[in-house]
Every structure is written in C-alpha cells, then in structure tokens.
Amino acid sequence: MKNNLSKFVSIFTAFIMIFGTSLFFPHVSAFADDNNANLVSNGDFESGTIDGWIKQGNPTLAATTEEAIGQYSMKVAGRTQTYEGPAYSFLGKMQKGQSYNVSLKVRLVSGQNSSNPLITVTMFREDDNGKHYDTIVWQKQVSEDSWTTVNGTYTLDYTGTLKTLYMYVESPDPTLEYYIDDVVVTPQNPIQVGEISNNQITIQNDIPDLSSVFKDYFPIGVAVDPSRLNDTDPHAQLTAKHFNMLVAENAMKPESLQPTEGNFTFDNADRIVDYAIAHNMKMRGHTLLWHNQVPDWFFQDPSDPTKPASRDLLLQRLKTHITTVLDHFKTKYGAQNPIIGWDVVNEVLDDNGSLRNSKWLQIIGPDYIEKAFEYAHEADPSMKLFINDYNIENNGVKTQAMYDLVKKLKSEGVPISGIGMQMHININSNIDNIKASIEKLASLGVEIQVTELDMNMNGNVSNEALLKQARLYKQLFDLFKAEKQYITAVVFWGVSDDVTWLSKPNAPLLFDSKLQAKPAYWAIADPSKAIPDIQSAKALEGSPTIGANVDSSWKLVKPLYANTYVEGTVGATATVKSMWDTKNLYLLVQVSDNTPSSNDGIEIFVDKNDNKSTSYETDDEHYTIKSDGTGSSDITKYVTSNADGYIVQLAIPIEDISPTLNDKIGLDVRLNDDKGSGSIDTVTVWNDYTNSQDTNTSYFGDIVLSKPAQVATAIYGTPVIDGKIDDIWNKVDAITTNTWVLGSDGATATAKMMWDDKYLYVLADVTDSNLNKSSVNPYEQDSVEVFVDQNNDKTSYYESDDGQYRVNYDNEQSFGGSTNSNGFKSATSLTQSGYIVEEAIPWTSITLLNGTIIGFDLQVNDADENGKRTGIVTWCDPSGNSWQDTSGFGNLLLTGKPSGVLKKSVTFNDIKDNWAKDVIEVLASRHIVEGMTDTQYEPSKTVTRAEFTAMILKLLNIKEEAYNGEFSDVKNGDWYANAIEAAYKAGIIEGDGKNMRPNDSITREEMTSIAMRAYEMLTSYKEENIGATSFNDDKSISDWAKNVVANAAKLGIINGEPSNVFAPKGIATRAEAAAIIYGLLEKSNNL
C-alpha cells in the first residue's frame, strides 16, 4: 500500500459522504436503465469543471482548454509520488462479475523531457478481504506531441461487502504532468438474468487434475488472491482440484504486510496459508524485497520525508521486515507451515542486465541483495531462498547477467537456494532459448522454479491462436519434464483467464474466463484429446540433386521442426526442409539422434490434395525410411549418417497432381527413436501430436509451394562509413523492403551490401517523412535493423555467429541480446526524404570466399508522431521474430573478390623444369601446399589420402578439430587425425564404413571427388547430371565417380592425360594434387 493511502481513503470516504452518496450497503446495486451509458458523469470536462473527480494523493487538478475533443480537459500537475493522480469513484455504479471497457485520452504537458513518460490506470477496491490494486492498463507510453488513447478492460470481483471502489491514473515518473480527456467506462455485454455469473459457473470435475498428471515431476502451483478462496467460489474449487502449491499474488508483498512502519497485517496472507493447509498444499512466499509495491516510508528519513533514509536505517528496516515476516509464519504455523521457500529479492536486474536503479540500490548499494539473503537465512535457516526475475528465459543478456550475479553470490557464501524464472512468455517464445536458459542457470548448482508462468496472446484470442498456444504449452511442459532434475516447481500466475494481470483481450492461462479447460490444458494433460494447430511451411521452387552430397541449394531453405513429442520427452528431433518442382516434392530431413540404432527411422505422411480428410483417400501416402536406408521403395531416397545422427534426402512424386505455385500439400513427419531398449522409446512429430497420422490426414501440416529462395548479392569492396552514398556504392544492385510485418504503408528503404575480409557493409536509404525517437524502447524508434546469420544455419534461435544490429536516424546504436557488437561501426545522415544508415558489421565466424552465402535481412521501424511504432517492413522475413529466430532470414551471396595471382615468393629446387612449377609456387605462397623439406617439393611423389585432405582444409581455411575416433584406422596422435575429423564433419571426406585409409595413395578419381566437394563450398555450384565423360577410358571410371569426374572436366578443373585418358585408378602425384587445387581457386575466382 502506498504512503498516505490510509489517510487518503479516510478523506475519500468523507468526501463521498459530504456529497450525499450512500456508500455503505451490503450489495452493489444494478445498472441504470441505459446499459451502454458512460459511468463517468464528467469524463469530457465540457462543464469547464472537474466535478465528480477527486485526488489520489495531493496533486493539483484543474479544468483547462488543452482539449482533445470539445473545449476542455483536466490538467494533472504538482505530483510528487508515483501513485498520485486523478481518481473517480465507481462505488454503486458497477456490478459484480461484469466486465467494462475503459478508455481515456492522455497528453503530456510540454517541456518536461521525462525519461519515463508512462501512464498506468488502476482500480482500487476494498472489501472484506482488505485492499486490492487491480491494473487496468500498465505503463502505456504517452507524449506531448499528440493525444494518446489509452484502452483497457476491467472485471469487478470482490468478497463480502465492497467498501471502496475508485479508478485512478498514475505514472512511474513521480513528477510527470499530463492532461486527461474523454474518459469513458461502459459495460461489456451487461449481465442479464440467466447469464453466467460466479455462482452459476460449474468447474469440470471429470477431467484429470494437473497435480496428479505431473506428480512424478514437480508440484503445480498457482497465484491466488484471498478474495477468491471461499469454498463457494468456483475459482477456489478449480484451485483445489488442480493445484498443490500456492503463492500469494499480492498479499505477501511488503505494502500488504507492513503498510506503515511497525504495523504488520497478516490477515490476508494467513487466509491463503490456512487454505493451503486445509487442502494439503505447499506454498512459495512472494516477496520479501521488491522495488514495486513497497511503501514509500521504507526509503524516507523519519524526521523529514522529503529526504532519503540513511543506509543503516534502510538496512535496519529491511532486516526488521524480513525477520518479522518469517518469524510470523514459523511461529504461528510451526511444523504445519506450508511455505517451503521465499523469493527474497524480486526483479533486481534491469532489462540490459545491470542492477536495477532502485531506491534499494541508490541508498544501500549493491550489497542490499546479499544482506536480504543473510537476514532471511538468519530468521529461518531451514527456509529455501530464491532470487526471482522476468525475461531470464530468453538466453540473452539478462540470462547471462542472472548467471553472473548468482555465481558471484554463491562464491561469496550467500545462502541462495535457487533461481525463480517468472516465465511471462508469449505464443511466439522460443523453446530452444528457454531450454538453454534453464540449463545455463541450473549449472550453478541451484534449484530452478518456474514462478509466474503465463503465455501472452499478444492481443489475438482467435481459435487459431489458442491452438498455437496449446502446442507451445505442450512443448514447454515436455521441456520441463525433461529438465525435472533441475525444476522443483512450476507455478501459474493466475487460475483462469478472467483473473489474469495482463491487459485484455488476453487468454494466457489453461482455463478460460468461465473456468473451463482450454486447448492448452488438454495439450499438457491429455494430448490425445487435443486439437493440434495446423502449422504451415514453404517449399521453395527448385530441383535439388539426391545423392551422396547434400545439394548446396538446401542452404537457402528455411526449415520446419519435428520437435513435438508424442511419446517420451528426450529423444530424436529433426529439421525438415522442402523444395518442389513439377515432378517431385523434395525433403531434406536432418535428424539429431545421439543414440543410433537400427530401429531408428522416419515416417513421411503426404496428403497431395490437402483436403484434411479423417480417413485416407487415394492421393494420400505413408512412407517409412529407416536410418540404415531401408524402407519404402516407391520413392527416391538417400540416407547417410553423421556425427549428429542421420540425414534423409527424399524425392516424393507429385507429378500426378500437376502442382503449381501457391498450391498446398498436406505433410507430417514422425521420428521413431530407439534409445537402446530395443524398441521405440520416443516419438516426435512436426504437426499432429495426437499421433493419428496413420489413419487421419486432418491434422497434417500445410506445405505451400512457393517461389525460389530470396537471394541478394554483396560485391567485394570497402566503402567509407560516413553516412553518405559514396561512388563505390553505385556499383551495387539495391534491394527493397516490401514485406510488411506491422501495418501496410509507412517508412521503407532501399539497401545495398558490400563486403571485404573484415566487414559486411550495409547502406540503407530510408524514406520517412516524420522522424521520431521519443520512445524509451529503441525498437519503436525510427530505425534500421540488420540481421546476420554468418553460417546461414537458419536456426530457430540465435547462435554465437548471429547478430541483430539496430541504428536509429540519429546514429544511436542498440543490439539484440546475444549480439557481439565489438567492432561495429555506423554513421547516419538526414536527407530530404528521410535518412541514410551506413554500417560496418565485423565478421567473426566464417571463412570468406567468393560464393559464400550468409543469412541476411533488413528491417525498417517506423514511429508515428507519438513515438508509437506503427510500421515494420523487412526485405524477407514476414514473421516479426527475426530478433530471436534466424530461420526466416533471406540469403546474401558474397561475390566479386578480384582475381590475381600472388607474387611467387616461395620456390623449390626440384620444380624448376616441372610442368606444375607456377602452380606449386602460388599454392606454397598461400601455405596451401608445403614442401617435403624447405627446398624439395618432390612433385612426382604420390600423395596420400590424408595429405590431400590436409591440403583441402588449408584451401578452405577450415580449422582442425579434436579427433573423436570414428575410424578404426585413424588413431589419436596421428599427424592427420584432427584434419580427418574436421574434413569428415565438413562433409569433404566420407571413408568407407569404419575405415578412412589415410595412408593409402589417393587415386585420381578419389582426388577429383574430394576436390568437387570443396568446389561446392567455394561457389554456388550444383552438380549436373551429365553421366558419361568424353575420356577414352570412361568405362574404367567407377560408377560412383563418373558424374563427378564429368562435371569437373566440363568446368576445366581436370584434364586428361595424353591420348585423352583420365586414368581414374591411377595414383595421383603431388604435382597433380597442386594442379587440381589451383583449378579450384581459378574456377571459383579466388586466386
């Protein structure tokens, strides 16, 4: 409770009584006759007065002519506390159980330069269970340039007698001054006789209770308010049925327990504890210290409240509060005390990872955190103590900051038991990031508890969005179950959607506003009864080659993910890419499986006409492919194993349906994984997690036949980063941002890209007639964002090579959470039509060659005159998730690096008259080949498979890797072992079964095969189906090598010996090895 609030409530009550309104009655009256009437009688202030409005605290309220509509508004000035502002009473005007729409217009008084121009709308109510603060709108940004419409909803609920009910407008900036106009509060579909109200709601008692579903994993908890714990309240009934752990939503926060110094009030907190004991539940205590919902007196000098308390006084007050609170529950409840842990400190980290600049930090210093833990441990040594925070599940800068903080606290002996991950996520949150965050934080040796779980719908509560939410909840709880060794509790922040703290419209929990089970409930409680959402993915137009080498064109395709478990929670998953032409649907299934078995395999389900029938029709197909390559024989397939699992390439005939652009094909993918038991232990799917694919196509996902991959070109060159369009940029073709993520018009850009050995350069010329950077959020300012995926892995999460680089029109830089910004440079300039952003993004993770393709996208953010982002437009990705997901990036081809033979600074005595002299000298100068001694190259000496492999690695600038022992004839310690490992992982060499034959002399056809794999990595080369060569000894070439040799000959990389023979089984010499490597450089324009 805020400082002076008790005094305010007394004044408020007296005010109402003076004005003759009857306040004290046992039940709220019904509505007036006009159900759609505005409940605010003077919301437009057109009377020229503020009649009907009262003060929260002691601000100055006055009618003014700075109107939104009409002639008058209300000016709010003279604020000195965050909670101060105008208030309006709704006592006697609102009906229990009814929902209301709330709308008002707000504009800042000019000239304030506030760093926190935010408005919060709150409803204060007092009933038999005490005082409550219900958020209607949380921290809406407003500006002085124009009026901002603030919208929210409110549902009235209370226990016993409603004594006080008023709405007030506040701000986290305690001195912010603002105007208010056009305040409208109207009922939503007013409750009529016969409609559902609390006493008519019946919960579903015949469905599985959640605490039993997860009894082998962790307690399932829920945040509660004591006003909803009466036995007749269906919220209490739902709580008792499904949950076995409670946390107080507000009743145990500092302002609730000690509103004034020394006066502790435990009535509401005790009601929750009593309920927990009566229903055999455990509890989490929340929270002993927070920067919010803590009375101002904590931080004030008792002799002069305008001055801050001293460090010693604030520490004394903190210790008194913590000790008194823990002693109360320990003493009153003894062995029955259900509280097993406390959030000692809550939200001490800012979003940028630094310690929050709270009054605790300002007055005490950073050691206030360890002091709080010290006091709590001293008060109750048996209690588990947690640090709790939000946005630490994204595996970004705040996750790392929490890791560093807890590591430091533990190293100093602070008695910290665990980390509370609030987990306020949304329907686009990334499971891989959550998994990485849990495992990172758990590696500190502490418990992990999910403490405030809900899933924001981002304003979309459509049926489609609810089904999408259900899938993510299932994936989330499968992850929690897989991480059960770390997770000791999962707590939802609210029992049902009607009591969520989030602004409406929203539906973030498992039970809806009528307390009925939603799709999300069934997805985690009994997936067989769920209705899966229909996911969609694009198949890009193209005809990849199916064979020993994975076609390079797959690099351009965004994957879908077969990662939803049907059985088990830890096992094989896969990325699946799709392409199409008029004959085939092509799939590349890359399975991650660390327990290889002959039982492992995939199943592909195809519904060619995508009519989603509940039984198979003649166009529907089911294919099975085992990890050893056996299986369905009526499709083209190729299966190879690798260090991560196995890869399946498929060509599925679709010529019979005459496919055309934008057609849809139904598809599902199922993975079967034997983890060593001799039977299938885990089953994973892309779409249908009810596992009905064998007989039912209605839950297959959709594959949309789409255009070829989006590829732009960056040419080699080095511009000056000065925010100007230098002449060098005129050589570059431009791309245009025309993929709308938010809005359909507004600021756009043309962009050009260049590269050199140190940087990727980007020039964006933005058209924007109204520049604004007033938002406190950089992403809402007029700005350009560049997204880079250096290895173009197109993962659903950010890897270490990925980056998000944001620059606004005033050259203010900001970056995504995991982006390495070291060395980043930018410059901007204003133009008649907008602004220019020029950037230099340092390379960190890849070998730079002509033909390299990286993942790339560019985004323009457009702010309106109020600082609100109204437009987002990209070059490629329409998802809006580029900040956390690289799979939708487009592709950028690096080209144009000049050719030119290096000075021949290295020579050997024995190559003076050799036909390959010039070639050997160039390669030796580049350290790609080496002599047998400093003076002898021995060009006629045969070359081994290991030696040629080492040369190719140097050509590609691939670093050696520690040998993992894949081959029986390669031993740790062999000079070539690490080179073999790196080349094997890169797909340059394959071996034959368990042998690599490293010391065998390499044949000419073997050398050509390896060389062409290297050429594919240097360029965008795609192997043609040529078949026979023109060599006289074509019949002597092995079948597996014939097409490779034919392609190499066509490109001029190899030549025959005299008499036009290739001599495929002939042993290659060191001179011939140098010649073919030189040919690779020459033909790829990398000399």
Swiss-Prot record:
Belongs to the glycosyl hydrolase 10 (cellulase F) family. This is Exoglucanase XynX. GO terms for biological process: cellulose catabolic process. Its EC number is 3.2.1.91. Residues 1-30 form the signal peptide. Residues 204-527 form the GH10 domain. The active site is at residues 347, 389, 452. One of its GO terms (molecular function) is cellulose 1,4-beta-cellobiosidase activity. It catalyses: Hydrolysis of (1->4)-beta-D-glucosidic linkages in cellulose and cellotetraose, releasing cellobiose from the non-reducing ends of the chains. It comes from Acetivibrio thermocellus (Hungateiclostridium thermocellum). It comes from the Bacteria. Residues 37-188 form the CBM-cenC domain. The keyword Transmembrane does not apply. Keywords: Carbohydrate metabolism, Cellulose degradation, Glycosidase, Hydrolase, Polysaccharide degradation, Repeat, Signal. The keyword NADP does not apply. Pfam families: CBM9_1 (PF06452), CBM_4_9 (PF02018), Glyco_hydro_10 (PF00331), SLH (PF00395). The lineage of its organism: Bacteria, Bacillati, Bacillota, Clostridia, Eubacteriales. Residues 903-966, 967-1025, 1028-1087 form the SLH domain. It is an enzyme of class 3 (hydrolase). Coiled coil: none annotated.
